[in-house]
Amino acid sequence: MLEQQQYHLIREHMQPGDIIAFGGNSLFSRWTKLTTRSAVTHVAIVMQTKMRDEDSNRYFNQVMEATSFRGKRGVMTNRLSERVASYDGDIWWLPLSSASRSIFEQNKRDFFNFMFEQDGKPYDVLQLFGSAVDAIDEH
């Protein structure tokens, strides 16, 4: 059952590997929803939790995603609190199931190595459009 929660109430429960799903309201996001027939326009992966913020001495969550944010485009790591505060659309937290968490824990070194290799890659607009075409293909 989906339940709406404030970010500050759930942030401490997030763990690396959890999925954050976004459903934007921009023109591009609405087009993506139409062509993919999905409420989700892109996803991010929680990479690190409880990383100390040197300015406030508090902890925060980081996510990795392929997006356009703060004038940059591509695969990047962002503070989840900043994404939540500035995102125009819906956001869902999808924690890993117990079985998936167990598999993740057994393979997390390879997972993180793969993810860090993706950081900084450019946004692949052609692949994005190709994905949308695949979604509407009836074959």
Model-derived features: positions:
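Short, surface-exposed secondary-structure edge patches
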Residues: 8-13, 35-37
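A structural signal for well-ordered alpha-helical segments within the folded catalytic domains
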Residues: 15, 38-41, 109
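Loop/turn positions that initiate beta-strands
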Residues: 16-20
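Glycine-rich catalytic cores of cysteine/serine-nucleophile enzymes that process amide/ester linkages
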Residues: 22-103
